[in-house]
């Protein structure tokens, strides 16, 4: 696990990179530990997505919506998912315990342990994901 000081440095680096991307600026020198999230090949994609407000987009949808949120997601917070649900009250919302951003089982918010789940293609989806998707798409 990261020490408190290292965790603070990591958080500052992430905030700084995100600020630059939100301003439409590429970040050429990304620390090695953050390359998986902010490598140069994904930065243009992230910049383009920062121009959208998910709450405004979901509010306009006239189709059924499924929101699956893991309580161990380090990229999208539970609060963010709840804001989506509030913006689209008819959405089918599920908070799934011990699930991360990749919808894999994960019982920690420790960055290193999380990254291990990101890079292991053998790990299956969380057991509830397919059940909830099947129920959602099977609704009349």
Describe the predicted segments one by one.
Residues 1-6, 10:
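Single conserved hydrophobic/aromatic residue that forms the stacking wall/gate
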Residues 72-76, 101:
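Acidic catalytic loop of the alpha/beta-hydrolase fold
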Residues 63, 76-87:
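Short alpha-helix in the alpha/beta-hydrolase fold that links the catalytic acid
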Residues 61, 67-69:
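Short beta-strand/loop motif that positions the catalytic acidic residue
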Residues 99-103, 108-140:
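Catalytic active-site module of serine/aspartate enzymes centered on a nucleophile-bearing elbow/loop
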Residues 41-57:
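Active-site nucleophile elbow and catalytic-triad environment of alpha/beta-hydrolase enzymes
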């Amino acid at each position: 696990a990261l020490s408190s000081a290292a965790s603070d440095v990591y958080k500052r680096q992430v905030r700084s990179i995100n600020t630059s991307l939100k301003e439409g600026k590429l970040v050429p020198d990304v620390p090695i530990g953050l390359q998986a999230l902010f490598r140069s090949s994904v930065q243009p994609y992230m910049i383009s997505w920062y121009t959208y407000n998910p709450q405004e987009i979901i509010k306009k949808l006239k189709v059924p919506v499924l929101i699956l949120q893991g309580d161990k997601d380090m990229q999208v917070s539970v609060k963010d998912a709840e804001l989506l649900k509030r913006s689209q009250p008819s959405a089918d919302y599920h908070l799934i315990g011990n699930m991360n951003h990749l919808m894999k089982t994960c019982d920690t918010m420790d960055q290193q342990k999380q990254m291990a789940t990101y890079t292991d293609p053998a790990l299956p989806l969380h057991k509830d994901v397919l059940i909830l998707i099947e129920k959602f798409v099977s609704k009349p």
